[in-house]
Amino acid sequence: MPLYRQESEWKRLGMELSRTTMANWIIIAAKEYFIPLVNRMHELMMKESHIHCDETPVQVLNEPGKKVTSKSYMWVYSSIKESKRSVKIFDYRPDRKATNPQEFLKGFGGTIITDGYYGYNHIDGVTNAYCWAHARRKFYDALPVDMKDASDTFANTAVEKIARLFAIEKQIETLSPDKKVKVRQEKSKPLVDDFFSW
């Protein structure tokens, strides 16, 4: 609940508690407890072998130096499903500059799974594995909407090929990470090789 509404609610109950006081409590709690916690989560994340990365626009009202209509970004970093620890960090930044993931991922030496945004391409020591879901969406968006039958199109063929990979992932969802790797090598790798040779 927004602080101005909490202030009204407390006043209705007979207590004078200003939103400034509550905002100060939040700031102190963040500095004392949440920032160290997020820093520890970041340390743990940097030890992972794979990290999902994605950035999404958000609109922030009354942000200093920016128009109300301008976009800011929430950069989301997440450990993979098979990780021993589930770590997700939301990193707010006022822009979409490549320096944002470079700073966040500094010292990481594993693989990042991304949507293909160029900002992830220049991070030292990192392997970039692009996300199949994002790739599928690009091909799906390229399907002609005015055609009665798009089955012979390049985009549809790509969507179908990626769907076969997704079907395998659905089948192995509950397997251990080691078993998933084995099945992926046996079943998914030939499909991926076919996709890139096609």
Task: Label the predicted regions.
Residues 1-198:
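Catalytic center-proximal scaffold of phosphoryl-transfer enzymes
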